[in-house]
């Protein structure tokens, strides 16, 4: 499959990160070095696109049997799954050990893992068929930095208390529920990166109490342009202390009885 939208995004991203050549440089060796950097990055982009293309093909193939996603058209998958997943790639920073709760078909962590082979991603989902798909993709794309685990969030959190530098979550739950699911997993000083749409403010207003209980602090809300008409917001929560080990609550209470206020 041709991934022109994703390709353009990755190349433009490299330019914004100062990888493009400065034609006004006074030093030939500096120009040569930047040429080398640009060539190397284009080689990386080719490798990325090969993996993303395989990912797309198998997503569509498995989707016919297991209903992994409602988004299947090539252009939509590139924008709403691939580009959307990697928009906040710059926020990961020094986070090396990252957890994705409710990973579904692998978004956002599989795209992030393709771009960040130096970071370890642990993907968790309670639906076994989704984990089976993720394991297939891990092997197909040789993603040695990805592990998939079949588990309920509550059980996984109890056994992995404050084990991760960061958590990412996309299209999983409202902020009060999401905070209770993820902050117990995050080390002090680590971050939650929550992908949200334009109505994120209402959710934030409802989670001040659970943030206080679980020692989380709103750091920032990062805005990205997904398309000319659509924006994506990533809510960044920092873990500033140790949270009580009794969270998240059992029995699906974080979702059914969220702590609001």
What kind of feature is each model-predicted range?
Residues 205-261:
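SAM/dcSAM-binding transferase cores
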Residues 59, 112, 196, 237:
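Residue-level signal for inorganic ion chemistry
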Residues 3-20, 24-26, 37-94, 132, ...:
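Class I SAM-dependent transferase core
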């Amino acid at each position: 499959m041709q991934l022109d939208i994703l390709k353009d995004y990755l190349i433009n991203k490299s330019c914004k990160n100062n990888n493009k050549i400065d034609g006004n440089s006074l030093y030939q060796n500096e120009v040569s070095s930047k040429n080398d950097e640009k060539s190397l990055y284009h080689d990386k982009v080719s490798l990325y696109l090969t993996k993303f293309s395989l990912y797309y093909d198998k997503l569509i193939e498995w989707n016919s049997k297991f209903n992994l996603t409602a988004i299947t058209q090539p252009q939509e998958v590139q924008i709403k799954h691939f580009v959307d997943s990697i928009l906040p790639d710059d926020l990961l920073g020094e986070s090396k050990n990252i957890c994705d709760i409710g990973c579904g078909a692998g978004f956002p962590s599989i795209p992030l893992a393709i771009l960040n082979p130096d970071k370890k991603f642990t993907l968790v989902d309670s639906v076994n068929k989704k984990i089976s798909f993720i394991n297939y993709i891990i092997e197909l794309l040789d993603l040695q930095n990805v592990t998939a685990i079949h588990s309920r969030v509550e059980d996984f959190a109890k056994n992995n208390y404050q084990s991760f530098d960061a958590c990412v979550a996309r299209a999983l739950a409202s902020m009060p529920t999401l905070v209770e699911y993820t902050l117990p997993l995050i080390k002090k000083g680590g971050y939650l990166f929550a992908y949200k749409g334009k109505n994120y403010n209402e959710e934030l207003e409802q989670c001040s109490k659970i943030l206080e209980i679980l020692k989380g602090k709103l750091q920032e809300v990062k805005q990205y342009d997904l398309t000319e008409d659509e924006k994506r917001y990533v809510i960044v929560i920092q873990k500033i202390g140790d949270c009580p080990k009794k969270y998240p609550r059992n029995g699906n209470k974080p979702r059914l009885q969220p702590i609001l206020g």
